[in-house]
């Protein structure tokens, strides 16, 4: 686009190099500003390009197309809202939502328990694994979609930790983490940790973190395995237990519980429970 540059333009009306228009002055002989096709073409194409770039077709009968186009161009892609879901339900998007980015975490597995011991023995369960993590973008079909939040694994004295369950939304599935295996009674043993939850259907699919091994070092030193951390809650798996007791529960969504620990001549213990999953939805215009 350009400012008026015909021979009768009012030179530097708005500052140096910023010509303007004049209606002329018969008393002084000043002519009114003449308009040429070049100027009108410039104005027409400048305005038309804004309207058409918004996807709106030019319509001679409408007088509001420029403001309609500006609103569409300025508002498109704007973050409208962030919603966090910790219980299953049906998704209702904010008015004006055209695109969503969904983050989902599966439920964490519970830590493995520990069995009863005799003198000279210890027992340490391994940590539960965290749920998988999925991120996906959707531009249609999301309004009214049902979703499921995965539950955390349960725990019981002297038993393997329970598995976490899957968190799902449309095509994505963030699998639950596996429960940790129960410890054995011995003077030295290693109980390998469980595997992280699977992740499918997203633009980003990341398996959960494995639970840590439960280890009996000697007849007097043992550690229950710590739980796996989820991708958005690092460090929130159930802590490792060095003393006799039930495993520590997970403290962040999708994380695994810690393993239980039984000292010498101790009773059976449970692992720590796994944490439930989560869905986060980012809504854009």
Predicted regions and their residues:
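Extracellular "spike/adhesin" assembly and maturation modules
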Residues: 1-74
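Surface-exposed, low-hydrophobicity beta-strand/loop segments enriched in small/polar/acidic residues
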Residues: 9-14, 40, 69-75, 97-99, ...
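Right-handed beta-helix
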Residues: 43-46, 50, 248-262
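Acidic glycine-/aspartate-rich tracts in secreted/extracellular proteins
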Residues: 48-56, 106-111, 150-156, 173-181, ...
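Glycine-rich, low-complexity segments
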Residues: 49-88, 176, 181-190, 194-198, ...
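Terminal edge beta-strands and adjacent linker/stalk segments
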Residues: 64-65, 168-172
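Glycine-rich strand-loop-strand elements at beta-sheet edges
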Residues: 84-86, 90, 94, 104-170, ...
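Acidic, glycine-rich loop-and-strand cores that form catalytic or ligand-binding grooves
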Residues: 173-248
């Amino acid at each position: 686009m350009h400012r008026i540059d015909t021979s009768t333009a009012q030179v530097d009306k708005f500052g140096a190099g910023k010509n303007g228009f004049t209606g002329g002055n018969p008393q002084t002989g000043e002519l009114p500003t003449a308009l040429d096709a070049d100027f009108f073409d410039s104005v027409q194409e400048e305005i038309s390009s804004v309207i058409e770039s918004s996807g709106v077709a030019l319509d001679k009968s409408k007088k509001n197309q420029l403001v309609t186009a500006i609103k569409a161009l300025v508002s498109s892609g704007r973050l409208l809202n962030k919603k966090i879901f910790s219980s299953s339900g049906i998704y209702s998007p904010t008015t004006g939502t055209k695109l969503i980015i969904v983050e989902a975490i599966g439920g964490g597995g519970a830590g493995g328990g520990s069995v009863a011991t005799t003198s000279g023995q210890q027992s340490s369960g391994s940590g539960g694994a965290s749920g998988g993590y999925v991120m996906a973008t959707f531009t249609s079909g999301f309004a009214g979609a049902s979703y499921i939040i995965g539950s955390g694994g349960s725990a019981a004295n002297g038993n393997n930790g329970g598995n976490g369950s899957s968190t799902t939304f449309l095509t994505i599935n963030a699998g639950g983490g596996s429960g940790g295996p129960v410890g054995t009674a011995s003077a030295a043993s290693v109980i390998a940790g469980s595997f992280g939850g699977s992740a499918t259907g997203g633009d980003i699919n990341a398996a959960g973190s494995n639970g840590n091994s439960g280890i009996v070092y000697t007849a007097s030193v043992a550690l229950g395995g710590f739980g796996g951390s989820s991708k958005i809650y690092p460090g929130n798996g159930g802590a490792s237990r060095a003393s006799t007791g039930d495993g520590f529960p997970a403290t962040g969504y999708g994380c695994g519980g810690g393993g239980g620990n039984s000292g010498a001549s101790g009773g059976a213990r449970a692992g720590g429970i796994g944490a439930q999953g989560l869905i986060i939805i980012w809504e854009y215009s």
